[in-house]
């Protein structure tokens, strides 16, 4: 987030907070959901460029070049989806952006695993190029399992530790994507150990996939350097991994497990700081009607999780998970990603502010995102010529 280190921006924001110059955008009349204390309190928000300059008592300032009156609505930080695959939704990044941004999701962490398994480094390059100018913030990760099953398939590339290390050296890459080859990591196999070590050496997160791991195997996976998991199988699995110290990403794609997770968290009596939310895989129709991570928040609350906890998991905890101190909190000095909600059950976004700009209203983006051409990836499915023998069958009697 180096743009927020701009000295002139900070001076302008400081002057606006003092009252010596107007805000670029003033949001007034809202009720702030405080992700630190859990309180609901009336507050106005002054924004300069992409930065929150002031969170102050309602009605104490009226000087904004643009004023957004949200009287009675709730103010939440923008939602952060800490693990997802655009490919699973079978849409382009620009289409995905417009589908979720309109509902309050302002940051997603993309593992372009399928792109890389077909197209290799050019697939990862496309993920970066196709997202860099979108109003939805994409944190692109370096796929760790290309191919996903070494020796068992014909992938379009082979990412060893050196390849992953090269990707991690790029500032656009936010970490190592989910490490699915758990057994080789636990066994200390050189290839996977080297990939995990590349993430540690780069000082970037190493994301996990710890489905079914328990006891010594789980401890070994974590000791290798993997820090998170989204592949929970039960409430007891959730609690073991929380107690072990993994950062848990509750995912919405296994809806049947969410009530069990909610029951365990409610029994615990508080939301751990190491619980964030993710979608992982969302089918196109669910994306269209649910809005991505917003729908996960909505369902968790419907199953009985306090709305403040669900939002904290989707904002402040998510920011902590991805190491972004500029996100996840409505406070002076933080990035101005804000969603304005009419209530805390339906979670319908009245307005969405991303990077200091109003980008959506009543579930629709104000400007459609621009597509980046994908021509190099056309005709990439290579099959033998279709013959009559290929579709013939023998009738069995």
Regions found by a protein language model. Give the residues of each.
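Conserved small/polar residues in nucleotide/adenosyl-binding loops
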Residues: 394-397
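Histidine-rich, glycine-flanked metal-binding segment
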Residues: 4-77
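Glycine-enriched alpha-helix->loop->beta-strand junction motifs that scaffold or abut catalytic
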Residues: 172-173, 220-228, 243-249, 271-274
């Amino acid at each position: 987030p180096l743009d927020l280190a701009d000295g002139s921006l900070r001076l302008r924001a400081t002057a606006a907070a003092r009252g010596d110059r107007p805000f670029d955008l003033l949001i007034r009349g809202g009720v702030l959901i405080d992700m630190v204390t859990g309180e609901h309190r009336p507050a106005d928000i002054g924004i300069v460029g992409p930065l929150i300059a002031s969170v102050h008592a309602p009605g104490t300032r009226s000087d904004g070049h643009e004023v957004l009156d949200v009287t009675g609505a709730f103010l939440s930080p923008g939602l952060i989806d800490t693990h997802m695959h655009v490919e699973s939704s079978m849409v382009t990044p620009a289409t995905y952006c417009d589908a979720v941004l309109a509902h309050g999701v302002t940051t997603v962490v993309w593992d372009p695993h399928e792109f890389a398994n077909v197209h290799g480094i050019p697939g990862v390059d496309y993920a970066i190029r196709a997202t860099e100018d979108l109003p939805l913030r994409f944190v692109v990760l370096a796929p760790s399992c290309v191919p996903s099953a070494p020796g068992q398939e014909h992938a379009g590339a082979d990412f060893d530790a050196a390849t992953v290390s090269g990707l991690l050296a790029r500032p656009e890459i936010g970490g190592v994507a989910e490490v699915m080859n758990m057994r080789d990591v636990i066994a200390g196999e050189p290839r996977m150990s080297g990939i995990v070590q590349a993430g540690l050496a780069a000082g970037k997160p190493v994301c996990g996939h710890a489905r079914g791991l328990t006891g010594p195997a789980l401890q070994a996976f974590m000791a290798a350097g993997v820090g998170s998991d989204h592949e929970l199988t039960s409430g007891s699995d959730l609690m073991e991994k929380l107690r072990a110290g993994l950062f848990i990403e509750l995912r919405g794609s296994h809806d049947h497990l969410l009530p069990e997770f909610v029951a365990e968290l409610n029994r615990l009596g508080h939301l751990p700081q190491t619980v964030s939310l993710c979608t992982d895989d969302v089918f196109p129709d669910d994306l269209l009607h649910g809005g991505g991570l917003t729908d996960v928040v909505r369902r968790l609350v419907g199953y009985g999780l306090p709305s403040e906890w669900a939002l904290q998991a989707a904002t402040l905890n998510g920011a902590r998970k991805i190491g972004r101190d500029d996100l996840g909190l409505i406070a002076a000095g933080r990035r101005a990603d804000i969603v304005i909600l009419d209530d805390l059950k339906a979670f319908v976004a009245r307005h969405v502010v991303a990077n200091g700009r109003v980008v959506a209203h009543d579930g629709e983006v104000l400007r459609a995102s621009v597509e980046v051409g994908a021509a190099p990836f056309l005709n990439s499915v290579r099959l033998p010529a279709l013959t009559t023998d290929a579709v013939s069958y023998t009738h069995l009697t």
